[in-house]
Amino acid sequence: MTSTTAARTASSRVGATTLLTIVVLALAWFVGFASRLFAIVRFESIIHEFDPWFNYRATHHMVQHGFYKFLNWFDERAWYPLGRIVGGTVYPGLMVTSGLIHWILDSLNFHVHIREVCVFLAPTFSGLTAIATYLLTKELWSPGAGLFAACFIAISPGYTSRSVAGSYDNEGIAIFALQFTYYLWVKSLKTGSIMWASLCALSYFYMVSAWGGYVFIINLIPLHALALIIMGRYSSRLFVSYTSFYCLATILSMQVPFVGFQPVRTSEHMPAFGVFGLLQIVALMHYARNRITRQQFMTLFVGGLTILGALSVVVYFALVWGGYVAPFSGRFYSLWDTGYAKIHIPIIASVSEHQPTTWVSFFFDLHITAAVFPVGLWYCIKKVNDERVFIILYAVSAVYFAGVMVRLMLTLTPAVCVLAGIGFSYTFEKYLKDEETKERSSSQSGTTKDEKLYDKAAKNVKSRNANDGDESGVSSNVRTIISIILVIFLLMFVVHATYVTSNAYSHPSVVLQSSTNNGDRIIMDDFREAYHWLRENTADDARVMSWWDYGYQIAGMANRTTLVDNNTWNNSHIALVGKAMSSNESAAYEIMTELDVDYILVIFGGVIGYSGDDINKFLWMVRIAQGEHPKDIREENYFTSTGEYSTGAGASETMLNCLMYKMSYYRFGETRVGYNQAGGFDRTRGYVIGKKDITLEYIEEAYTTENWLVRIYKRKKLPNRPTVKSEEATIPIKGKKATQGKNKKGVIRPAPTASKA
């Protein structure tokens, strides 16, 4: 009877725990989804930023024409006159995922536009990311820690920044694939099962198809295997898991057209292959260990490892030298040397996401989890095992990379949420332990302890306290106060995450918002206004020149041909556009004529104080152009005499006469941005411009938006017979005037007449 009651009690507890887990995960999914809809509520269902516009355009093309034609799609509206082969230059996982969801909904007679699927894809996947994080943390620590981690990542600003509604980018689905791949890797390592390793390889294949950050996975998992070997934790489970995963993952990843043979021909993938080979050697050594003497084993191990290691290094450098294996890319070098990209590849350094992360960003995106994260890391180090070595390596490497590049804050956030969940869970378990359970367990062993002497009892109590932890000597009031403080911190995290998501990460870049003194909202829709004008008032084959930041938006919203866009695959072509922007009007006209440019688009924020305009980006245009055309463009020529970058009174003549300056400030000298400001006062820079009377000779103003944010100019077509100016009409005759001889004066002879014979 007692055993039956105990079984029923245990079964009811398991059922209640399962129900609670499902409810918490469902709430985390719902809260994560709802908190990402601020942009939809305030504005409308619209695609955000820059890259998402190309992703949406590519997805729309795939849904209309099919996947096969998508892979063979040649985009003639990009990179004129070169064009772009889309299928072999994109990660198709995002498009395939959206297309599959759209097909399923359409099959169920839920007819929605593909744009709505794209807008709501990232918020939907945030719930899947929370579940994947729960599964990973559960394998690493406990179900309670998993629930904490799932709730953290559901609303963490570090992840929300790339997954709000409308942010249709690769990261929206890639973080789910990242966490799920890590979960399957830990599961396969714990079980040593080929099935889990195969599932891990399939999840990795999805990650490869979705985001270029898959390189982080294919280097972190080998690093984990190498660390286990060095720590003496080699096992057959590790051999089966890694060998199965690496072979399948490499073959599957090569099926993505954009990746191709990179897994076997690039340096970024060679560490994984090296660990694979090392694992075979270690397995062979373990096999031979019980079959030869210890001295023979040490000789074979040390000698064989040294020879094979040296041979591997020689073979690698020979393959790189011979061109069979590509060296490390510039982006890889920029992770180890933050100044490398600025000197050698300015196009990489010009991207704001590639800048180093400030200290404020860590606390802004992570809040209290950044402070608790080291606690969870310490708990994992204190109670280390095979799988916890993985999260330790993940955390340390992610912290470093996030400090080097602000974009990689996205890869740090999952690790922080996992370790913060472990930290909070373990702390709450310590300070909220059931007192009745402790008293019951102590009373069962109390009868034998009462018979012992006081000094013996004191020693036993001391040893028990040492085993249970320091919290045993803490009173219930102190435990209650600490628990309340932790709950307050968690509530503060929720408030902070909601505030940051609402005010910092839920504003589409194509729609700007400001407020008046009395709090009324002002919506500035200049971007879409300009793109709509281009779509309605220019020829279908018109070519638009702009800086590469706006290429995807022009192609997506205006449906016009661009010279460069956000793909940035051709540095020399971008440098040519930068040279045109940096040159004087006549030199720029020659470049634009060669490129068949019809319209030029620039972003100017001097009227409304928009800091992300082209004048503030102009130095990057100069640097990129200088890299390809050092004889024509020199960065120092655009500085003042004191070495400052300015468009004000002290600006250099080169700066005042360049095409970018003229297009930005044309007619601006006549404009007053405030009652107490002089004409030509630039709100963004905070001073009056250096040259107000700007005239244009080779281009003409075509359209300027309401708030002067977007300005469009048209390249003039020069006439075949140029008009001669009046002051140049008199042609001077050089040479001496004849004053002597029979040729002194001219003689007019009568015209010859024809007579009939």
Swiss-Prot record:
Transmembrane segments annotated in the record for this chain: 14-34, 122-140, 143-160, 172-191, 194-208, 211-235, 236-261, 270-289, 300-320, 359-381, 388-404, 409-430, 470-495
Gene Ontology biological process terms, A to Z: post-translational protein modification; protein N-linked glycosylation; protein N-linked glycosylation via asparagine
Region annotation (Interacts with target acceptor peptide in protein substrate) ranges: 547-549
EC number: 2.4.99.18
KW GTP-binding (keyword) present: no
Span of the annotated motif DK motif: 614-621
Residues reported to bind dolichyl diphosphooligosaccharide: 407, 552
Region (Disordered): 721-757
Catalysis: reaction(s): a di-trans,poly-cis-dolichyl diphosphooligosaccharide + L-asparaginyl-[protein] = N(4)-(oligosaccharide-(1->4)-N-acetyl-beta-D-glucosaminyl-(1->4)-N-acetyl-beta-D-glucosaminyl)-L-asparaginyl-[protein] + a di-trans,poly-cis-dolichyl diphosphate + H(+)
Record has Metal-binding as a keyword: yes
Record note on domains: Despite low primary sequence conservation between eukaryotic catalytic subunits and bacterial and archaeal single subunit OSTs (ssOST), structural comparison revealed several common motifs at spatially equivalent positions, like the DXD motif 1 on the external loop 1 and the DXD motif 2 on the external loop 2 involved in binding of the metal ion cofactor and the carboxamide group of the acceptor asparagine, the conserved Glu residue of the TIXE/SVSE motif on the external loop 5 involved in catalysis, as well as the WWDYG and the DK/MI motifs in the globular domain that define the binding pocket for the +2 Ser/Thr of the acceptor sequon.
Family of the protein in this entry: Belongs to the STT3 family.
Name of this chain's protein: Dolichyl-diphosphooligosaccharide--protein glycosyltransferase subunit stt-3
Source organism of this protein record: Caenorhabditis elegans
